[in-house]
């Protein structure tokens, strides 16, 4: 996006009222953040500038302070990524994305007189507050020692682990598990003692196990979260709430934030005295396959046909979940084209792949009619 387009984006976001604005990575992101701020104030909105240095910290800020939304600009070399944020620190849902795209296309912005234009204020020390919130959210730590390696350049993660009393080792030490933050801090990567990198679903399952162990009995998850979490919660006396309209404000940030998840898991290790490998072994099997299925007809027509074919499927605003004998299937329309997003899950990789092939074929049959 060029400067004028980013300014228009700021004007479109001004309908939120207050827009938290942050950036990281270089002069390009900083310059475009200025353009976005100008767009917000020109449309009568109020800009809250902050020094949060990651998209995850910006999400936490909106959640913690109850802000109506925000925008974070991340620059990595020549690539610039924009992260619009809604209330509660949530990413934009599909309907909100469509409205925003429509407003940008039509340039449907408010342009008040000078006396009614917006303004801005500042929030400082966001990263320090974000780190403290992540550490304190993990609850009580146990007395067992925990040693971890951290990927180079992960200063924030190192600070959080040290705060919890975790011993840090060099990354290449044999037999020492490792962690890293990815996707702008929103995802946690884990390598166990044998050097195996665990899947995103396994890390999510371990985070849920840590929350249940800390005393929480309800897990608040998006509709597409793995069905294996329901088995985990049932076995440990908990329940799963699939939230169609976002997770409640301030609730279980460790399920969508890498730093919060790392702190939660470290305290879990300190309470149990088990290794990460042992904790992963006690989780239900969860192998996932993802596929985008292109369509010649419309997404809604094929989704409707699949819904009629499987009347017992759980229909939700974002898609539908189908529980079969060997696993589960999540089907949702793609946001940017005539296609379906299919996510299949089974205890074994072979099962997940077979389910993925099966649903792809079923969708293809309806698409051919």
Q: What are these language model-derived features?
A:
Residues 95, 99, 104, 126, ...:
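Hydrophobic/basic alpha-helical segments enriched in Actinobacteria
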Residues 9, 36, 58-61, 157, ...:
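Buried hydrophobic packing segments
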Residues 52-53, 152, 203, 223-225:
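Short beta->alpha linker loops
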Residues 1-9, 79-177:
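Gly/Ser/Thr-enriched, mixed-charge loops and adjacent short helices
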């Amino acid at each position: 996006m060029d400067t004028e387009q980013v300014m228009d984006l700021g004007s479109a976001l001004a309908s939120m009222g207050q827009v938290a604005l942050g950036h990281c990575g270089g002069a390009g992101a900083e310059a475009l953040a200025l353009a976005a701020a100008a767009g917000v104030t020109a449309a009568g909105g109020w800009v809250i500038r902050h020094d949060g240095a990651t998209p995850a910290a910006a999400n936490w800020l909106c959640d913690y302070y109850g802000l109506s939304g925000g925008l974070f600009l991340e620059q990595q070399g020549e690539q610039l990524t924009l992260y619009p944020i809604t209330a509660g620190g949530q990413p934009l849902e599909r309907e909100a994305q469509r409205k925003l795209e429509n407003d940008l296309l039509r340039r449907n912005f408010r342009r008040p007189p000078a006396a009614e234009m917006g303004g801005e204020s500042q929030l400082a020390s966001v990263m320090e507050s974000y780190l403290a919130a992540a550490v304190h959210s993990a609850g009580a730590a146990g007395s067992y020692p925990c040693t971890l390696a951290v990927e180079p350049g992960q200063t924030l993660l190192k600070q959080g682990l040290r705060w919890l009393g975790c011993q840090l080792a060099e990354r290449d030490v044999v037999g020492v598990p490792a962690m890293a933050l990815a996707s702008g801090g929103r995802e946690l990567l884990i390598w166990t003692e044998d050097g195996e990198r665990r899947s995103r679903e396994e890390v999510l399952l371990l985070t849920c196990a840590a929350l249940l162990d800390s005393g929480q009995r309800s897990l608040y998850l998006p509709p597409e979260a793995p069905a294996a979490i329901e088995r985990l919660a049932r076995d440990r006396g908990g329940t799963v709430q699939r939230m169609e309209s976002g997770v409640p404000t301030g609730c279980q940030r460790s399920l969508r934030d890498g730093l919060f998840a790392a702190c939660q898991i470290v305290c879990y290790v300190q309470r149990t005295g088990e290794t990460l490998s042992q904790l992963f072994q006690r989780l239900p099997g969860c192998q996932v396959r993802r596929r985008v299925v292109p369509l010649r007809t419309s997404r809604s027509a094929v989704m409707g046909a699949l819904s009629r074919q499987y009347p017992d499927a759980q229909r939700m605003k974002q898609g539908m979940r189908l529980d079969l004998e060997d696993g589960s299937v999540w089907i949702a329309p793609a946001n940017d084209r005539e296609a379906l997003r299919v996510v299949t899950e089974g205890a074994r990789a072979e099962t997940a792949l077979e389910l993925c092939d099966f649903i792809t074929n079923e969708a293809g049959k309806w698409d051919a009619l």
